[in-house]
A protein has these predicted regions:
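N-terminal maturation segment of proteins
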Residues: 1-256
């Protein structure tokens, strides 16, 4: 009943802005956006300073993407690198077990984890992420299980997803931090630049963890494209919400 009331209430909300614009077009919007960026990323740099760094990183990422694409152009023409079938991961559980063995010696060791993989209910799959790690409780007992949700309707590369959500991504990250016995205040802070940044960073190890050369090459192609796309989205986010780009400017930038 509560969820139905929420759904009904959301349906009554009417947009007051007919233009597609960022928060910079609202009073105090630029300051608000700058505060959000610094708070969520955990940095002191201004949005424009961040955009400058992103732009430089974009150039490097594009050159890397171009080099990899040229190196594996035959694979790009014949294989679907956006939906790779990994022999090491016939199931999500098998993939996690495999990754657990591959991070040894690369990342600090942690205790053996209990974890359960759940399927996202059919009614929630539309719009749900490819997967989600459900953050464990602060006082989680040794015999309690970590939980990862998998969306079977999502098209994507399972191994990269398992790296991001499991080993050595979110599940590993949270378990490792709990093992350090940090003050409880650490668990109350909210800095997505730290938590999500770590998981995205670990995706760069996916190809390194693989044995099959074709899977490795396809993963490198997919990762290079993802890296460039992430930087593109981050750069345009700043331009739209800090510098007032409208739709036409965004479109022109993408067409360059």
């Amino acid at each position: 009943q509560a969820y139905q009331h929420l759904a009904d209430s959301l349906d009554t909300i009417q947009a007051t802005q007919s233009e597609t614009m960022g928060v910079s077009h609202y009073e105090g919007g630029k300051d608000y956006y700058a505060d959000i960026v610094q708070n969520q990323l955990g940095v002191k740099a201004t949005p424009d300073e961040i955009a400058k760094e992103i732009s430089q990183a974009q150039d490097d990422a594009f050159q890397n993407l171009l080099q990899i694409a040229l190196s594996y152009q035959d694979l790009i023409m014949t294989e679907d690198y956006t939906n790779i079938e990994y022999q090491e991961a016939p199931t999500p559980e098998a993939g996690l077990d495999y990754l657990k063995t591959k991070i040894t010696g690369v990342f600090p060791s942690i205790d053996n984890l209990n974890y359960q993989v759940y399927t996202v209910p059919e009614g929630n799959r539309d719009g749900f992420a490819p997967a989600a790690y459900l953050t464990g409780k602060i006082d989680m007992g040794e015999n309690e299980s970590e939980s990862i949700m998998i969306n079977p309707d999502s098209q994507g590369n399972l191994m990269s997803t398992l790296v991001h959500e499991g080993y050595p991504g979110h599940m590993y990250q949270n378990s490792y931090l709990r093992s350090l016995d940090y003050p409880a205040i650490m668990y109350l802070t909210d800095c997505i630049g730290y938590s999500e940044g770590w998981a995205i960073y670990t995706e760069s190890y996916t190809a390194e963890f693989l044995e099959d050369e074709t899977e490795k090459a396809l993963t490198m192609i997919a990762q290079a494209e993802t890296d460039y796309t992430n930087l593109l989205l981050a750069y345009t986010d700043v331009q739209i919400n800090q510098n007032g780009w409208i739709y036409d400017q965004f479109y022109d930038y993408l067409c360059e």
